[in-house]
Amino acid sequence: MTEAVPTDSVDSKASSQVNSAENPFPVRAVALRIAGWIDKLGTVWVEGQLAQITMRPNAKTVFMVLRDPAADISLIVTCSRDFVLRAPVKLAEGIQVVVCGKPSFYIGRGTFSLRLSDIRAVGIGELLVRIDRLRRLLDSEGLFDPRLKRPIPFLPNMIGIITGRASAAERDVTTVASARWPAARFAIRNTAVQGPNAVSQIVEALRELDRNVDVEVIVVARGGGSVEDLLTFSDETLCRAIAACRTPVISAVGHEPDNPLCDLVADLRAATPTDAAKKVVPDAAVEQRLIEDLQRRSAQALRNWVSREQRTLVQLRSRPVLAEPLRTLTTRSEEIHRAQSAIRREIIRLVTTETERVGHLATQLATLGPAATLARGYAIVQALEDGTQTVTAAVLRSVDDAPTGTRLRVRVSDGAIVAVSEGRADGP
């Protein structure tokens, strides 16, 4: 509401002055100018979330704060008490509304506000349309891409939990997780889970836990509720904060039918907070049974292996070569001895045969040779050179080969005789 003060003289004086460091405008002049500009704006329609409603007893004016969750910007709106009582919707902090009002500037305190003339609640259908529009936007940017999902550690060192203070969701996660894995540790951050401050508090808690090196997984948990109750978890700022986390995030908001956008951005969706507890830590009893089963299977596998190897050894030892290892050597030794004896006998036989053959040939040679002929009374006659014992020609075969006076060498069986030819003899 613009404060009514006499401004003509002040405004005209300020307008006639050249504004500078030497000629500054007084505060009232500036405030009046701003008030004049704002008065010319007319009425505007504005959408936002009711963050605060202040209705003091006996006060005629009600002050409210209209907030834009996506930008964390607020605007003061005012209306009469009767306007609130006659409003077509039940005004409560956290609801999304569309208001119509006249901008005004209160000169006394230099504050800007919006004087309401109409207010309407944003319908569920419209909320769903906006959520779907945001879903398509985030999907087009790749925030739902399965390839970007970070794996949940099998056994996290510490579990970060963001949930309402003393809520059933907190109790479900911690109780079930501790029952499944008694050594589980938690870093719990209690925040508003609906209302005007929910988004900023959850985003701040997310960033704090993401910076904590001990926290290896973060669970965002809330129980079920209406579309309006869960609107916080379809907020664009929160969705982008989850996508920016380096730590894996599990969304456990609402119940099975609920599907806020943070479910799609998170690395893993849990149907309920209890389901999140089951997914964030293994069941110690199940793991113990698994280990025991693996131990039994390993022991049985080892026993089976030993049995197979024992049977193999028995089979190998039952083979003749291993049952009586010297038998093969003895057999081979006997074969070698037999071969040696056979070779020796064959060599003796061959030597004997060849000796006999040589003796037979020697006998034949002796029988057919000249010595045997001489022994039977024959003689070999050869001519000698004069005055020497040197044989000059071959064996004489004709009387013409030994004319008279030829010196001759006559070989008989036991020696040789030198003679002189006296010519041809009569008779044969």
Curated annotation (Swiss-Prot):
Keywords: Cytoplasm, Exonuclease, Hydrolase, Nuclease. Disulfide bonds: none annotated. One of its GO terms (biological process) is DNA catabolic process. The keyword Nuclease applies. GO terms for cellular component: cytoplasm; exodeoxyribonuclease VII complex. It is found in: Cytoplasm. It is an enzyme of class 3 (hydrolase). GO terms for molecular function: exodeoxyribonuclease VII activity; nucleic acid binding. Its main location: cytoplasm. Its EC number is 3.1.11.6. InterPro entries: Exonuc_VII_L, Exonuc_VII_lsu_C, OB-fold_nuc-bd_dom. It catalyses: Exonucleolytic cleavage in either 5'- to 3'- or 3'- to 5'-direction to yield nucleoside 5'-phosphates. HAMAP family: Exonuc_7_L. Belongs to the XseA family. Heterooligomer composed of large and small subunits. PANTHER family: EXODEOXYRIBONUCLEASE 7 LARGE SUBUNIT (PTHR30008:SF0). Bidirectionally degrades single-stranded DNA into large acid-insoluble oligonucleotides, which are then degraded further into small acid-soluble oligonucleotides. This is Exodeoxyribonuclease 7 large subunit. The gene is xseA.
